[in-house]
Amino acid sequence: MARILDNDVMGNEEFSDRTLRPQYLREYIGQDKVKEQFAIFIEAAKRRDESLDHVLLFGPPGLGKTTMAFVIANELGVNLKQTSGPAVEKAGDLVAILNELEPGDILFIDEIHRMPMSVEEVLYSAMEDFYIDIMIGAGDTSRSIHLDLPPFTLIGATTRAGMLSNPLRARFGITGHMEYYQEKDLTEIVERTATIFEIKIDHEAARKLACRSRGTPRIANRLLKRVRDYAQIIGDGIITAQITDRALTMLDVDREGLDYIDQKILRTMIEMYQGGPVGLGTLSVNIAEERNTVEEMYEPYLIQKGFLMRTRTGRVATQKAYRHLGYPYQNT
């Protein structure tokens, strides 16, 4: 069952994300360091009438990597063609996409770390020298065809930058690290979304939503919609701080943005293993979740908020986790 705090896109959220997507850097809320850098790089490329260097965007899900790719295309005034690593299964799939590019176009590859190595290798010459050599036919009848490509910009997005090969990573001239959002930026995003969807919300309610959104706009917007539902049925349709607290309590989202699964992880470590260290496999069995799910979906936020530490001997619940859940802390 999907969690309301999942970073991945749910249901019809792809349409919602497009509706809310800013078009230009001046409209993009948050990620100030990345925006400042890109504003300079984009303007320099435009003045030289050149394609922008290839861009790698990396960071946790839901932080606006896809949105930033579209913003870059709009700022440059060029077309963007979109695909994903898993969708490009064969080298021929990528060649077909590259062959359709016009001068200056952007090719956006989401989840680029999941692209097969045989496909990735086609990108090397395409990115560096704007050509590809492909083999057609088989056996004695096979031959190589050289295809020149127009200058283009590849934007790759990944949640797992460490999984990129060194040759691919080295071909990106620009990198953008998308970080978790600050409370003030998320509050502004909640208020902007409320305005677009004509939802009535006061500032304190928006701030409370932002505090519990795990630093992620996608989660903030999802929680806003669920609190709106609660306000319409239980209240008078206006989202107040009190309504927000009651709705999020009903949804099992606490003041730190932890849900019942996050709390279950920490409680299991504290109650059964004296806070740890606990091996990932042992922890996964105890909470009935897959190892990868625990490592990729739950742990990053718990670590970022200081509730959990990864050590060489296993996972350890911090003093902050004890305090947050109301357990006495014993420093052994």
Curated annotation (Swiss-Prot):
GO molecular function: ATP binding; ATP hydrolysis activity; four-way junction DNA binding; four-way junction helicase activity
Stored SUPFAM superfamilies: P-loop containing nucleoside triphosphate hydrolases, Winged helix' DNA-binding domain
EC number annotated for this UniProt entry: 3.6.4.-
Binding site for Mg(2+): T66
The UniProt record lists the keyword Hydrolase: yes
Binding site for DNA: R291, R310, R312, R315
EC class (word): hydrolase
UniProt entry keywords in alphabetical sequence: ATP-binding, Cytoplasm, DNA damage, DNA recombination, DNA repair, DNA-binding, Hydrolase, Nucleotide-binding
Large ATPase domain (RuvB-L): region residues: 1-181
GO process annotations (BP): DNA recombination; DNA repair
Gene3D superfamilies (alphabetical): 1.10.8.60, P-loop containing nucleotide triphosphate hydrolases, Winged helix-like DNA-binding domain superfamily/Winged helix DNA-binding domain
Gene Ontology CC entries for this record: cytoplasm; Holliday junction resolvase complex
One Pfam family hit: RuvB_N
Residue numbers spanned by region Head domain (RuvB-H): 255-332
Family annotation (CDD domains): AAA
Residue ranges of the TM segments: none
Catalytic activity: ATP + H2O = ADP + phosphate + H(+)
Principal location: cytoplasm
Function: The RuvA-RuvB-RuvC complex processes Holliday junction (HJ) DNA during genetic recombination and DNA repair, while the RuvA-RuvB complex plays an important role in the rescue of blocked DNA replication forks via replication fork reversal (RFR). RuvA specifically binds to HJ cruciform DNA, conferring on it an open structure. The RuvB hexamer acts as an ATP-dependent pump, pulling dsDNA into and through the RuvAB complex. RuvB forms 2 homohexamers on either side of HJ DNA bound by 1 or 2 RuvA tetramers; 4 subunits per hexamer contact DNA at a time.
Family (UniProt): Belongs to the RuvB family.
Name the record gives this protein: Holliday junction branch migration complex subunit RuvB
Organism per entry: Streptococcus pyogenes serotype M12 (strain MGAS2096)
